[in-house]
């Protein structure tokens, strides 16, 4: 990417914002080397990485990057055979622990393929960390127990030091006290000494190690402890040698993990960089741009990331319906800001950064981005000479190769307007032929006409409010800019006579074009008002529709709840009836064990008839259901009318007039219920109501009960796989149904197996009064796996 472009568009300031959000020096190095990529897949990967980091922070998950150090120098020194000091080793241990914590955090996340892949490069280093922490404490000092030898040496040193202190304490408190400057013991050159007044040098035999700045005090090692000091010095040398040996061993362990440590540092740098990108995206309220392979740029509500305070967002595009955009308008109206925003957005997107813009923003991957904006100054200063502009444009034309975005500020300015406009049109035409996407700002009215007469060239302008005499900073695509000089002068107080006279100096063509442009601006302003009103009305209509849908949904839910409640009540009644019937049957079974077989069969038949009647009260027949579906929505219902309850699929009679809420009381069999008119249909008179003519219908059904039962019932029951108790219960019910169905004989399949089930069935049949006889199955009947029972008539 062109270095001058990066400098002019202030890409370095974006990198500074990124660097402020890194947690390690490793991450900052990645930021410093950041440059826009020109490979589509690489840009896509960078954007996805930023989105993953942003999602973590959006979810309240901060990436744990604390405790990580740049160990590259430490590792290199260890690899060369150098010895790391305890502080360096402590950095290694801290980084190992932090790497492990970071790895675990990323592995626990879902939907982050790029960051998860980076986490696989992070080492754990359990053994290395344990070895270092066993030898080095949290203050960066080698522990006494780092080795048995070191522990013994330091123990001996403490004993010797205590003995020396005791002897020196006795010395300074004894007869020699009067010779001392102060009654203290201090250390010089690693040896214990006492401060002796210089005039008493001869009275204190010993070795002089130092003298005070004033010369009045000598620091003397008394002869009584010289030997002990010598012993202490020897122990100190041994301590140093043992510490060096320990540090060398730990350094060799670091060297052994060199490759893994360097891979970890590389992953840490990239993760820290991704974290910074995610933070910046959140802080600037950015969105991930949609990447496209075509060299286009489409910005929705884009905000220049370096501008402070309230920024008016811009909407602009190029490369879709046109390839050259000519922006006109007043100074300080935002033309240069628009140029810089477009260029910087492309650089940021190709560097993998999200953009401070709205959803729908699309960016293609440009191989080159060129700018000619002022004298490479900031947004607030964009003036330059004609020669400076032209020199840079020549450089751009010479370097132009692949798909490029070219941004030209005040094209052709700084020279004769006629020649400058001609040059500007020629340059734009040349760039268009070379396939570049070009955005140029200008004051020349000739370029407005040029844009209207060329294909894939479009006008744009920055809006100016003549009422307030201030620019609005809005960029209007398709509308050429107007100087507004006459109107502004009039509003500022210039004599109308002078303004009118000035208009006379314009050529007829110039005046016609200026009037046309002002008319376009007026029409656009009116259309903007109408569009705003239409948007307001559409929003109001949408709100009303949502309110209606909400109320309709509430009504639907209430109706469904009512239907469900009624259905539950019906099911409860049916369940109660079934329980009562089963209770009667159970009682009859118990009683009939002591009664004659005929009486027992009659009681069972009676009980099942009761069950059938209860079922018919709440469950309509198939014929009734078909009849009910022929009903119509009722009008003018009155008590006694026959109706169908749609939600329950049952019929009944109206018992009351509709109330204020449109509900009536309906009798359906044994069930009385309040039903909405919207849930009713008028039933035909031929269609029997639930509970109406019940006995007759029961008799009609009863006539064919045995025949129907016999026709539908299987003459065999399969007990295989059942426990004995469960099997006997099924046999008992099966025999009841078989007797009711009038079956002459039945087959009971129990399988061969161990024979336990067959024995239990045989024993039950032996004592059952419904069974006349029984036998094992014959050839073709299942053999010993089947028992055939003949029932009493």
Curated annotation (Swiss-Prot):
Enzyme class of the recorded protein, top EC level: hydrolase
Ranges where the record places region Disordered: 611-639
Any single GO BP term: mismatch repair
Biased composition (Basic and acidic residues): 623-639
GO molecular-function term, one example from the UniProt record: ATP-dependent DNA damage sensor activity
Family: Belongs to the DNA mismatch repair MutS family. MutS2 subfamily.
HAMAP family: MutS2
Function summary: Endonuclease that is involved in the suppression of homologous recombination and thus may have a key role in the control of bacterial genetic diversity. Acts as a ribosome collision sensor, splitting the ribosome into its 2 subunits. Detects stalled/collided 70S ribosomes which it binds and splits by an ATP-hydrolysis driven conformational change. Acts upstream of the ribosome quality control system (RQC), a ribosome-associated complex that mediates the extraction of incompletely synthesized nascent chains from stalled ribosomes and their subsequent degradation. Probably generates substrates for RQC.
Subunit structure: Homodimer. Binds to stalled ribosomes, contacting rRNA.
Name this polypeptide is given: Endonuclease MutS2
Organism: Symbiobacterium thermophilum (strain DSM 24528 / JCM 14929 / IAM 14863 / T)
């Amino acid at each position: 990417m062109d270095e001058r472009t990066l400098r002019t568009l202030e890409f370095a300031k974006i990198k500074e914002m990124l660097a402020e959000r890194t947690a390690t020096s490793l991450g900052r190095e990645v930021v410093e080397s950041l440059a826009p990529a020109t490979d589509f897949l690489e840009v896509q990967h960078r954007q996805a990485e930023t989105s993953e980091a942003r999602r973590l922070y959006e979810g309240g998950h901060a990436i744990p990057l604390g405790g990580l150090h740049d160990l590259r120098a430490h590792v290199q020194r260890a690899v060369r055979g150098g010895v790391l000091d305890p502080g360096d080793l402590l950095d290694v241990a801290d980084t190992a622990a932090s790497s492990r914590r970071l790895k675990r955090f990323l592995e626990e996340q879902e939907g982050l393929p790029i960051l998860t892949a980076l986490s696989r490069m992070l080492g754990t280093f359990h053994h290395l960390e344990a070895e270092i922490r066993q030898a080095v404490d949290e203050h960066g000092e080698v522990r006494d127990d780092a080795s048995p030898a070191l522990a013994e040496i330091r123990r001996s040193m403490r004993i010797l030091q205590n003995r020396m202190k005791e002897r020196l304490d006795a010395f300074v408190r004894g007869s020699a006290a009067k010779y001392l400057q102060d009654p203290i013991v201090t250390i010089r050159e690693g040896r214990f000494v006492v401060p002796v007044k210089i005039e008493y040098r001869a009275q204190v035999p010993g070795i002089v190690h130092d003298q005070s700045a004033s010369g009045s005090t000598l620091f003397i090692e008394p002869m009584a402890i010289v030997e002990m000091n010598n012993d202490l010095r020897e122990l100190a040398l041994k301590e140093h040698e043992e510490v060096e040996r320990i540090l060398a061993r730990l350094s060799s362990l670091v060297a052994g993990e060199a490759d893994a440590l360097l891979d970890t540092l590389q992953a840490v740098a990239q993760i820290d960089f991704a974290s910074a990108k995610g933070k910046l995206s959140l802080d600037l309220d950015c969105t991930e741009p949609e990447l496209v392979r075509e060299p286009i740029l489409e910005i929705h509500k884009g905000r220049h990331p370096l501008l402070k305070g309230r920024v008016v967002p811009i909407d602009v595009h190029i490369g879709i319906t046109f390839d050259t955009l000519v922006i006109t308008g007043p100074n300080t109206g935002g033309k240069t800001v628009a140029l810089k925003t477009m260029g910087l957005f492309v650089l940021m997107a190709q560097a993998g950064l999200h953009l401070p813009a709205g959803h729908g923003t699309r960016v293609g991957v440009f191989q080159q981005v060129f700018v000619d904006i002022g004298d490479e100054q900031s947004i607030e200063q964009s003036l330059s000479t004609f020669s400076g502009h032209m020199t840079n444009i020549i450089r751009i034309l010479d370097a132009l190769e692949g798909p490029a975005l070219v941004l030209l500020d005040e094209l052709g300015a700084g020279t004769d307007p006629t020649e400058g406009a001609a040059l500007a049109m020629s340059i734009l035409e040349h760039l268009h032929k070379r396939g570049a996407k070009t955005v140029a700002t200008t004051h020349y009215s000739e370029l407005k006409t040029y844009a209207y007469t060329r294909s894939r060239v479009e006008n744009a302008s920055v809006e100016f409010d003549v009422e307030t005499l201030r620019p609005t900073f809005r960029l209007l695509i398709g509308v050429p800019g107007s100087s507004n000089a006459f109107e502004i002068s009039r509003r500022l107080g210039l004599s109308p006579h002078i303004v009118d006279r000035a208009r006379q100096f314009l050529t007829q063509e110039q005046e016609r074009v200026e009037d046309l442009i002002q008319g376009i601006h007026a029409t656009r302003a009116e259309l903007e008002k109408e569009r705003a009103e239409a948007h307001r009305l559409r929003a109001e209509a949408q709100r009303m529709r949502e309110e209606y849908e909400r109320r309709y949904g509430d009504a639907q839910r209430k109706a469904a709840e009512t239907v469900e409640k009624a259905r539950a009540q019906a099911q409860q009644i049916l369940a109660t009836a079934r329980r009562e019937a089963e209770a009667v049957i159970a009682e009859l079974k118990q009683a009939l064990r002591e009664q004659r077989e005929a009486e027992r069969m009659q009681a069972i038949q009676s009980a099942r008839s009761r069950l059938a009647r209860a079922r018919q009260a709440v469950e309509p027949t198939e014929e009734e259901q078909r009849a009910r579906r022929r009903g119509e929505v009722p009008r003018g219902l009155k008590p006694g009318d026959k109706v169908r309850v749609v939600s329950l699929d049952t019929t009944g009679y109206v018992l009351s007039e509709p109330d204020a809420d449109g509900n009536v009381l309906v009798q359906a069999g044994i069930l009385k219920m309040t039903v909405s008119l919207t849930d009713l249909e008028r039933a035909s008179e031929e269609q029997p109501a639930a509970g109406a003519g019940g006995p007759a219908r029961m008799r009609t059904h009863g006539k064919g009960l045995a025949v129907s039962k016999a026709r539908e019932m299987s003459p065999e029951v399969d007990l295989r796989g059942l426990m004995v108790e469960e099997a006997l219960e099924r046999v008992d019910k099966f025999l009841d149904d078989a007797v009711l169905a009038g079956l002459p004989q039945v087959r009971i399949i129990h399988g061969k197996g161990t024979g336990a089930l067959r024995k239990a069935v045989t024993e039950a049949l032996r004592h059952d009064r419904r069974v006349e006889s029984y036998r094992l199955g014959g050839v073709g009947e299942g053999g010993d796996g089947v028992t055939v029972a003949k029932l009493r008539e």
